[in-house]
């Protein structure tokens, strides 16, 4: 719990930087000072009613609601970024969520495995986020690219050079029995070999 006068944004930024984890504001108690009450009462007295051309009574606030809303709301540069990731699956969901949620300025991160996309909202630098994702997920991205290359059609020249992965099992009983006795210790640590 933190009390006193301080800059909330700087405090959150320092907490995120020092701990490397996501920090959030759970509750915020604001003290109402006497000056604020006096200002609110003065604003209420300023709302004067007057008649418009049709004869209806209109408050002064109702005349320009758009201007007052813009003044009351501070501008934030919250953006929404949607990333499509081809290799997204359940086993990478947690890893990607961790990388993105630890990034500075990210407010929410939703990982949709079915549609293979990630939706990120917050105030962050897109280029830095891309670099961070590439850096952390490089091995997995390269792995998926290799798998995609294998799916491409093979020309006739390449067919002769490729090992088709066909291996014949020992056909005679002697070879099978010899293979049973000469088992490597890496495959079965409890086995013994008799030579």
Curated annotation (Swiss-Prot):
SUPFAM superfamilies: HMA, heavy metal-associated domain. One of its GO terms (biological process) is embryo development ending in seed dormancy. The keyword Metal-binding applies. Pfam families: HMA (PF00403). Keywords: Lipoprotein, Metal-binding, Methylation, Prenylation. InterPro entries: HIPP4/7/8/17/18/19, HMA_dom, HMA_dom_sf. Gene3D superfamilies: 3.30.70.100. GO terms for molecular function: metal ion binding. A lipid is attached at residue 192 (S-farnesyl cysteine). CDD domains: HMA. Residues 36-76, 145-172 are annotated as: Disordered. Residues 193-195 form a propeptide. Residues 78-149 form the HMA domain. The modification Cysteine methyl ester is found at residue 192. Residues 47-76, 145-157 have a biased composition (Basic and acidic residues). Belongs to the HIPP family. Probable heavy-metal-binding protein. Required for female gametophyte development and function. This is Heavy metal-associated isoprenylated plant protein 18. The gene is HIPP18.
């Amino acid at each position: 719990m933190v009390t006193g006068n301080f800059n909330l944004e700087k405090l959150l930024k320092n907490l995120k930087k020092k701990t490397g984890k996501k920090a959030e504001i759970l509750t915020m108690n604001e003290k109402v000072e006497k000056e604020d009450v006096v200002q609110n009462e003065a604003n209420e007295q300023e709302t004067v009613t007057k008649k418009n051309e049709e004869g209806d009574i209109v408050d002064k606030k109702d005349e320009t609601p758009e201007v007052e809303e813009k003044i009351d709301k501070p501008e934030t540069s919250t953006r929404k970024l949607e990333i499509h990731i081809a290799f997204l699956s359940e086993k990478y969901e947690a890893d990607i969520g961790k990388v993105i949620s630890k990034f500075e300025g990210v407010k929410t991160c939703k990982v949709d495995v079915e549609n293979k996309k990630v939706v990120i909202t917050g105030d962050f630098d897109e280029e830095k986020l891309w670099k961070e994702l590439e850096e952390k997920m490089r091995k997995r991205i390269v792995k998926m690219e290799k798998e995609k290359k294998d799916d491409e059609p093979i020309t006739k020249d390449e067919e002769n050079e490729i090992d088709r992965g066909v291996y014949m099992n020992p056909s005679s009983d002697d070879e099978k029995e010899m293979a049973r006795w000469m088992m490597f210790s890496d495959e079965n640590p409890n086995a013994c070999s008799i030579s």
